[in-house]
From Swiss-Prot:
The gene is rplX. One of two assembly initiator proteins, it binds directly to the 5'-end of the 23S rRNA, where it nucleates assembly of the 50S subunit. One of its GO terms (biological process) is translation. InterPro entries: KOW, Rib_uL2_dom2, Ribosomal_uL24, Ribosomal_uL24_KOW, Translation_prot_SH3-like_sf. Belongs to the universal ribosomal protein uL24 family. This is Large ribosomal subunit protein uL24. It comes from Koribacter versatilis (strain Ellin345). The keyword RNA-binding applies. Part of the 50S ribosomal subunit. It comes from the Bacteria. One of its GO terms (cellular component) is ribosome. CDD domains: KOW_RPL26. Keywords: Ribonucleoprotein, Ribosomal protein, RNA-binding, rRNA-binding.
């Protein structure tokens, strides 16, 4: 995938629509548009073996962290009606993201 355009931004709340974490909701930590992937808080958890490093004050062991999932596997969550698609309202710089179901503003999320 190369440079996917998306309406999902950092700190948005999204719901996972497919995969092993289907049904979970979380906050977007990072969007990686050139790979078409997204990091969602507490979704796609993997175990990472960490080597101790006393200089950086890092304790060794097995750490859990989020792994990236495909942007196509998530849907933006509207506060009123739940997971939804995104519509756009306005022109030019006045353009804003709105819920496709109920029309409420999603920009302030």
């Amino acid at each position: 995938m190369a440079n996917v355009t998306t309406d999902i931004k950092r700190n948005d709340t999204v719901a996972v629509t497919s995969g092993k974490d289907k049904g979970k909701q979380g906050r977007v930590l990072r969007v990686i548009p050139d790979k078409g992937r997204i990091l969602v808080e507490h979704v796609g958890m993997v175990k990472n073996h960490v080597k101790p490093n006393p200089q950086k004050n890092i304790k060794g062991g097995i750490a859990e962290q989020e792994s990236a999932i495909a942007i196509s596997n998530v849907a933006l969550v509207c506060a009123k009606c739940g997971p939804t698609r995104v519509a756009h309202k306005g022109e030019g710089k006045q353009k804003s993201r709105v819920c496709a179901k109920c029309g409420s503003d999603l920009t302030g999320k």
